[in-house]
């Protein structure tokens, strides 16, 4: 067990990589020397963490509160993660969203973490805080605010301007995190400074980290410590090279962790598993890098992101599906991982332009919990089986990982077996998989192992074990089932539980058609079958041996006080392990000392308590569902589900049982095509009398950007405070009659588009691709211009978000906007440029919805995307029925009321389609979807792939009025028509989830200075 002890750091003198002044070595050493016995609630040894003195496997899921901007729904997600058997959540905070205006960190409304911490505590979830300042996370600029991109210093270096820029945010978030630490009764147990800080340009792996890099990490750590953070720090080294591990000096963290994505990201070919990142020796690398801390994987692939022109997140869910979870996650357990975080477990939404340019609105990520908070993906259930097994297997946490060798223990070279040997216990674990982990074939084998009754070859009663397709299995020997010894089991363990009167219930499972076998000591009574049939049983030496073939039929055996359930894997999916509340300070947090109930209960069970001799359950059902209490620590005489008493019966084996009746509710949703839509021209800039007097003049003759501009002034959007959504440029000149073409090189990120006009004449569009971040092109002018007459180019650019970056590359600074331009017959200085983005730029108008929610379009600048704008004077026109007859931008708005039944969780989404016969529905066009002011969809008709845009309750008012607006940007001369737009519901779920308080929805009011 290790406490946060004093660190004595030898600081070697070395030159800085960057020229700007660096932070003082002395101040960083002083900070390290003050880290003596900061707390004793979270400690560790080489095997695992201890929380309040109890050894815990930390099984964590990644969930970002900023991607679900309805605080009232955070508890729902936490409960679904708790029900997986997880006990922790890792979360990022996004500096770019919280300090979009320099010096003003927004921490109220949807940006407040108070409810996040409260909900985590109530759900029994410990938190791993990851405030950055750089987070990556497929966010625009990796979470770095746009104004920071203007700095001269290299981002993530020890440059004085960069470090000082982080101070206000890190001090603010540090104090918020400190207040929520376990030492203050909160849920935060670990904190991670920076993120994947493992490379630097022109620095080799052996030379990294340099003194400069160490200073950057140490500075972030000091910021957190100065703010009062005392819980252990942890690093996520995506190189697995020991960077910043304990004992490495300046910048070292308390715990060493890695992150890895071995399945990679090809969602278009999800059945092709890559092999070059599959880990085989992590137990050795960890022992070399950090032998005194538990093996921690701070990020491991739980899905994948998809990009513009991709295949949708469903392909990503297939890439990292239940089979991958069985094979690749179990491979990690073979290395003895003690802290395991799955990225993502709930992804959410890149609403309000918060994502980077490589992703679209959905951040579903193919995660175990879908974007609309559903848990129907099979990998949710597979993760539940694994997490619950590890939770009741304390011997795993102290076991010593062995080496996986093909043919060992089986004599079959097509099988790889990785042993974990009991360390202070008699329990051994054997992880079995195909030698070629990508294999989809079937192979038969026998397992020869040593047990307390001697060496045995399993199965003993004839036949063979099998691996069918992509699979991996945990076999155990001498496994402790609460004072009963399970001599061996080829079937996997879901869980075991303590019942009343010293009863123990063990749940084993396997795949359909598999043959399995387990053995019990012969001093127990001969096992008897009390439910099911077709079980073979014999005494072998000093053991009872039981064999069966897995079918959908449940089999239950009893041997004295031990009850064993033999299940088909898909039946095990329907079982839930719920920890009963305990006294403070444990309360709802997971603890090996707590009592549990085991219930078969369908779609979701959330919580349990025993009150007044009744078992009170909360949960969700999507069909009429039988409940059966498989195990409980005491007897009771009734079941209450979501507050309703159920008629109880007894099952065949005497368990208390009941049925939850499901009745689909009546749901009435508006037909968006039939609504009264109001229309506004949102590109008045191309009208002959438009004045851009209030626009930003682009007169900067310098830039700190590493890409130097070529004209007389810089045209980069970030240099003028515009960082997302969309951009509009206006280039003024006087004609001389020699104009025949204009050259424009524009940048908007992958998937971007642009449209260009000369006065009122449409010159064409770049409609975008899934590859181009920039696009240079010559555009022919359609007619001879009149000498001496003023003209103006209007250029609309879609801003898809900034890039992410590897440390030191400054890739996130790559400019958006116009990079280069030329006009035939003119010097470039003849054009005078103005531009706009969102109204106010960094002094953005809507602090409620954040700095990136709005773009440059006229309706957005005026705030008409917000509820209750002055639409009475707008003409009636529908994006679905009418659309646009030429290139341009239209803005459409409507309102409707919803009155959905309470007691049901009813996921809603807006679905775009091309069902219209009008040819304009097949043109290149782009839409933004605003729901009560929140931008919850960017739809690209000709590129895709996203057509379905979930919007959560709390953004949509399920019992009230909703304001919906759609911007329609037609990129082709024939115009555009939204071929179809529907509000659709998924299967309603009878649910115990709490109806959320709506997110703040301030409405329209006149904006000072709007143009």
From Swiss-Prot:
Its main location: secreted. The keyword NADP does not apply. Residues 1-19 form the signal peptide. GO terms for molecular function: beta-galactosidase activity. One of its GO terms (biological process) is polysaccharide catabolic process. One of its GO terms (cellular component) is extracellular region. Keywords: Carbohydrate metabolism, Disulfide bond, Glycoprotein, Glycosidase, Hydrolase, Polysaccharide degradation, Secreted, Signal. Disulfide bonds join 267-316. Gene3D superfamilies: Beta-galactosidase, domain 2, Beta-galactosidase, domain 3, Galactose-binding domain-like, Glycosidases. Glycans are attached at residues 202, 406, 423, 455, 588, 622, 704, 745, 759, 772, 778, 913. Substrate binds at residues 92, 136-138, 195, 261, 365. It catalyses: Hydrolysis of terminal non-reducing beta-D-galactose residues in beta-D-galactosides. Cleaves beta-linked terminal galactosyl residues from gangliosides, glycoproteins, and glycosaminoglycans. Belongs to the glycosyl hydrolase 35 family. This is Probable beta-galactosidase E. It comes from Neosartorya fischeri (strain ATCC 1020 / DSM 3700 / CBS 544.65 / FGSC A1164 / JCM 1740 / NRRL 181 / WB 181) (Aspergillus fischerianus).
């Amino acid at each position: 067990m290790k406490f946060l002890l004093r660190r004595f750091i030898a600081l070697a003198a070395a030159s800085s990589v960057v020229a700007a002044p660096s932070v003082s070595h002395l101040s960083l050493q002083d900070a390290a020397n003050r880290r003596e016995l900061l707390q004793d609630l979270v400690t560790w040894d080489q095997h695992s963490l201890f929380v309040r003195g109890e050894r815990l496997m930390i099984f964590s899921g990644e969930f970002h509160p900023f991607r679900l901007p309805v605080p009232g729904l955070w508890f729902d997600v936490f409960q679904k993660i708790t029900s997986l058997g997880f006990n922790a959540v890792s979360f990022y905070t996004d500096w770019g969203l919280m300090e979009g205006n320099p010096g003003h960190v927004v921490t109220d409304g949807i940006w407040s973490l108070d409810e996040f911490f409260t909900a985590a505590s109530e759900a029994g979830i410990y938190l791993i805080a990851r405030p950055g300042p750089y987070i990556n996370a497929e966010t625009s600029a990796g979470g770095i605010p746009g104004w920071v991109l203007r700095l001269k210093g290299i981002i993530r270096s020890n440059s004085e301007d960069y470090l000082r820029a982080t101070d206000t945010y890190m001090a603010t978030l540090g104090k918020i995190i400190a207040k929520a630490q376990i030492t203050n009764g909160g849920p935060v147990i670990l904190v991670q400074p920076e993120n994947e800080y493992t490379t630097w340009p022109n620095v080799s792996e052996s030379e990294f980290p340099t003194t400069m890099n160490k200073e950057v990490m140490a500075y972030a750590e000091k910021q957190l410590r100065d703010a009062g953070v005392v819980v252990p720090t942890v690093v996520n080294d995506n190189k697995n090279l020991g960077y910043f591990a304990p004992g490495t000096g300046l910048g070292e963290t308390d715990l060493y962790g890695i992150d890895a994505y071995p399945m990679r990201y090809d969602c278009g070919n999800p059945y092709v598993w890559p092999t070059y990142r599959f880990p085989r020796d992590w137990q050795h690398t960890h022992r070399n890098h950090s032998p005194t801390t538990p093996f921690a994987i701070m990020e491991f692939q739980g899905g994948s992101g998809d990009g513009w022109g991709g295949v949708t997140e469903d392909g990503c869910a297939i890439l990292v599906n239940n089979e991958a979870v069985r094979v690749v996650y179990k491979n990690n357990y073979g290395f003895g991982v003690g802290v395991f975080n799955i990225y993502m477990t709930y992804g959410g939404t890149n609403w309000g332009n918060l994502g980077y340019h490589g992703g679209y609105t959905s951040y579903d990520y193919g995660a175990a919990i879908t974007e609309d908070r559903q848990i129907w993906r099979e990998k949710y259930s597979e993760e539940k089986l694994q997490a619950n097994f590890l939770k009741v297997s304390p011997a795993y946490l102290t076991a010593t990982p062995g080496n996986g060798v093909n043919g060992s223990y089986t004599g079959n070279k097509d099988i790889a077996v990785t042993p974990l040997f009991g360390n202070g216990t008699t329990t051994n674990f054997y992880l079995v998989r195909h030698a070629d982990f990508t294999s989809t074939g079937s192979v038969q084998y026998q397992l020869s192992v040593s047990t307390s009754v001697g060496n045995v070859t399993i199965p003993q009663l004839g036949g063979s074990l099998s691996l069918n397709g992509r699979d991996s299995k945990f076999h155990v020997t001498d496994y402790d089932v609460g004072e009963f010894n399970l001599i061996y089991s080829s079937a996997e363990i879901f869980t075991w539980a303590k019942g009343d009167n010293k009863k123990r219930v063990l749940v084993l499972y396997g795949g359909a058609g598999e043959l399995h076998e387990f053995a019990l000591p012969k001093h127990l009574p001969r096992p008897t079958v009390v439910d099911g049939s077709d079980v073979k049983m014999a005494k072998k030496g000093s053991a009872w041996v039981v064999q069966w073939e897995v079918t959908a039929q449940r089999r239950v055996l009893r041997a004295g006080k031990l009850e064993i359930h033999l299940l088909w894997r898909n039946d095990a999916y329907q079982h839930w392990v719920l920890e009963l509340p305990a006294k403070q300070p444990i309360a709802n947090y997971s603890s090996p000392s707590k009592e549990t109930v085991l219930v078969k209960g369908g779609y979701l069970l959330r919580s349990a308590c025993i009150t007044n001799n009744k078992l009170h359950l909360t949960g969700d059902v999507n069909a009429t569902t039988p409940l059966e209490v498989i195990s409980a620590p005491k007897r009771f005489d009734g079941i209450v589900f979501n507050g309703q008493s159920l008629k109880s019966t007894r099952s065949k084996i005497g368990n208390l049982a009941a049925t939850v009746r499901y009745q689909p509710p009546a749901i009435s949703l508006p037909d968006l095509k039939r609504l009264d839509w109001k229309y506004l021209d949102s590109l008045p800039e191309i009208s002959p009398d438009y004045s851009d007097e209030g626009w930003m003049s682009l007169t900067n003759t310098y830039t700190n950007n590493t890409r130097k501009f070529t004209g007389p002034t810089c045209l980069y959007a970030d240099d003028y405070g515009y960082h997302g959504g969309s951009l509009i440029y206006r280039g003024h000149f006087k004609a001389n009659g020699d104009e025949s073409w204009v050259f424009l090189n524009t940048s908007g990120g992958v998937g971007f588009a642009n449209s260009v006009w000369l006065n009122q004449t449409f010159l064409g569009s770049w409609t975008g691709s899934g590859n181009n971040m920039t696009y240079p092109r010559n555009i022919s002018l359609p007619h001879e211009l009149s000498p001496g007459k003023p003209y103006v180019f209007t250029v609309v650019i879609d801003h898809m978000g900034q890039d992410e970056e590897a440390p030191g590359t400054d890739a996130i600074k790559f400019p958006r906007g116009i990079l280069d331009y030329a006009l035939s017959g003119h010097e470039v200085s003849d054009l005078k440029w103005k531009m706009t983005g969102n109204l106010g730029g960094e002094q953005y108008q809507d602090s409620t919805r954040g700095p990136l929610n709005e773009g440059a379009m006229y309706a957005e600048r005026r705030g008409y995307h917000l509820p209750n704008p002055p639409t009475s004077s707008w003409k009636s026109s529908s994006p679905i029925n009418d659309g646009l007859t030429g290139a341009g931008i239209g803005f459409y708005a409507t309102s409707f009321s919803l009155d959905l039944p309470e007691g049901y969780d009813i996921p809603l989404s807006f679905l775009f389609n091309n069902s219209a016969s009008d040819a304009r529905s097949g043109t290149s066009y782009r839409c933004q979807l605003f729901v009560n002011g929140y931008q919850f969809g960017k739809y690209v008709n000709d590129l895709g792939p996203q057509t379905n845009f979930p919007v959560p309750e709390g953004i949509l008012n399920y019992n009230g009025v909703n304001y919906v607006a759609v911007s329609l940007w037609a990129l082709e001369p024939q115009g555009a028509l939204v071929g179809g737009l529907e509000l659709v519901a998924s299967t309603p779920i009878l649910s115990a989830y709490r109806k959320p308080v709506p997110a703040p929805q301030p409405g329209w009011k006149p904006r000072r200075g709007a143009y």
